[in-house]
Amino acid sequence: MSAHIINGTEIAAAIREEIRSEVIALKAKAGIVPGLATVLVGDDPASHSYVDSKIKMCQNLGIYSEHHPLPQNATIEDLLTLIAKLNADPKISGILVQVPLPAQISESLVLNAINPDKDVDGFHPVNVGRMCLGEPCFLPCTPHGVQELLIRSGIKIEGTHVVIVGRSNLVGKPLANILLQKAPGANATVTICHSGTKNLPEITRQADILVAAMGKPKFITSDMVREGAVVIDVGTTCIGYTPEGKRILSGDVDFEEVKEKAFAITPVPKGVGPMTIIMLMLNTLTAAKRAAGLIK
């Protein structure tokens, strides 16, 4: 029997409507419009596409947006000056600097320069620390999206064994921190595996919930998955192009093989991907409400 397919597009659409309603209510009751500033350095086509999708989503939800493109040869001083301006702008609730950045710009310096209260990507050290302590903070968008996918699919997280394959600062580490918190929608036992892990299949087969986030197409095969497990595929790798020039994407899981063994599984595309951008919008809304003193 094939697995239940967790449709991230449908779940993200439901959250989108919730956010739209809140944005309308916030403007009507308090005269507040959330605002997102995006910053893009250089001409990377994929980065341009990601930023465009965020701008369009803002427009769709009634969130004010500004886009600040900088040339490929921009200096760290150029970027820090812009960030300081955005930090001080009351119209801007959240700031997103699209990565990767050119080699001459230190990503850590840029992240540290963003006001933690406007760090809607959730990667400022202050927000990372708050996340580890279980305090209110902006959660990184993709890991938060994974958690919401599980919760809204009715999948129990509490008391389960979650195995995450991948230890990146973007997904693996923050997701582990989110899911091990003593809180609703978390409280799991979490194991992180990586390139140095020995006997990887033995560990992944112990997972009630298996999360693949290493960026290796079809790395997770059916022999690595326990019968009846939930499999979340965070991987998104371009493996080619259609005759029309559209990207062909592959996840980290051999979907066709694993779906015959898992209880539930996310596809690629239309799985985790749509959740990332909607969590960014949710963080932007939250930032606006916090700035207005409506929530802590």
From Swiss-Prot:
One GO cellular component, as annotated: cytosol
Binding locations of NADP(+): 166-168, 195, 236
Catalytic activity: (6R)-5,10-methylene-5,6,7,8-tetrahydrofolate + NADP(+) = (6R)-5,10-methenyltetrahydrofolate + NADPH; (6R)-5,10-methenyltetrahydrofolate + H2O = (6R)-10-formyltetrahydrofolate + H(+)
Pathway(s): One-carbon metabolism; tetrahydrofolate interconversion
Keyword flag NADP: yes
Enzyme nomenclature, EC number: 1.5.1.5, 3.5.4.9
GO BP: L-histidine biosynthetic process; methionine biosynthetic process; purine nucleotide biosynthetic process; tetrahydrofolate interconversion
GO terms of molecular function: methenyltetrahydrofolate cyclohydrolase activity; methylenetetrahydrofolate dehydrogenase (NADP+) activity
Keyword entries, A-Z: Amino-acid biosynthesis, Histidine biosynthesis, Hydrolase, Methionine biosynthesis, Multifunctional enzyme, NADP, One-carbon metabolism, Oxidoreductase, Purine biosynthesis
SUPFAM superfamilies according to UniProt: Aminoacid dehydrogenase-like, N-terminal domain, NAD(P)-binding Rossmann-fold domains
Superkingdom of source: Bacteria
Family: Belongs to the tetrahydrofolate dehydrogenase/cyclohydrolase family.
UniProt subunit comment: Homodimer.
Classification via PANTHER family: C-1-TETRAHYDROFOLATE SYNTHASE, CYTOPLASMIC (PTHR48099:SF5), C-1-TETRAHYDROFOLATE SYNTHASE, CYTOPLASMIC-RELATED (PTHR48099)
Function: Catalyzes the oxidation of 5,10-methylenetetrahydrofolate to 5,10-methenyltetrahydrofolate and then the hydrolysis of 5,10-methenyltetrahydrofolate to 10-formyltetrahydrofolate.
HAMAP family for the chain: THF_DHG_CYH
Record-given protein name: Bifunctional protein FolD
